[in-house]
Amino acid sequence: MGTPQATITRVKAGPAEERRNVLSAARRVFAREGWTHTTLAAVADEAGLEPEAVGHYFKDKEQLLLSVLLDGSASVAAALTVAAEEHLGEVTDLEQDLAALGRAWLTPLTAFPEHFAIVRHVGAEATRLPAGVLEMWQTAGPRQAQRELARRLQATARRGLLDIPDAGHAAGRFVQLVSGPVVQHSFHGALPLPDFETDELIAAGVADFIRLFSPGSAR
């Protein structure tokens, strides 16, 4: 008597799962090809779907890019919010804690490589992007993260460790001085820097930040 063979039944993906599949495929394609060279057909092929299936969830390439950017930006902003809370929640050594925050602020470059590949394309193709995409991305991502950083810096100032009249301005200066040079030199993570160079840039930025915002400093 033969052994009965198991029957494998494929369960069709539901709408929510299929939409996530399209977004993941689009993220990979936009990361490789950028805005100009990405097509809905290429996204459908990457997702293993018919082009009509992609069109069911996203009416055009603009809506798809915006959805991918906002989804990635939300993940990055959430990670940076956690970093600010962890490193500024209880400050014991201001310089060391700010340096640790600076390193943590850079971790999304490696944690979300496809998102930052898209960001690099966005920078290069800014003049060709649909109207409104850049503003919505900035609002959902970088500005949201800086708002949370500003809130934590203001709490640090209330403890007398910093003198910050404008928390939003201070958050912008932190990003500019501490993480900005690493982002710039590494081309948004495309060419990672040696650890010693990253540490040197962060230390220099933190020193400048403390000089600007230490109690009694002249600005």
Regions found by a protein language model. Give the residues of each.
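Helix-turn-helix
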Residues: 21, 25, 29-71
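N-terminal intrinsically disordered/low-complexity leader segments
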Residues: 1-17, 28, 80, 217-219
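Short coil/turn segments at alpha/beta junctions that flank glycine-rich nucleotide-binding fingerprints
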Residues: 32-36, 112, 159-160
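Hydrophobic/aromatic-rich alpha-helical bundle segments in the mid-to-C-terminal region
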Residues: 10, 116, 135-139, 143, ...
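Short, flexible, glycine-rich and Lys/Arg-enriched loop motifs at helix boundaries
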Residues: 72-94, 188-194
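Hydrophobic alpha-helical connector segments
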Residues: 81-117, 167-174
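Short secondary-structure transition hinges
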Residues: 96, 103-150, 192-195
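Amphipathic, non-transmembrane alpha-helical scaffold segments
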Residues: 15, 23, 69, 73, ...
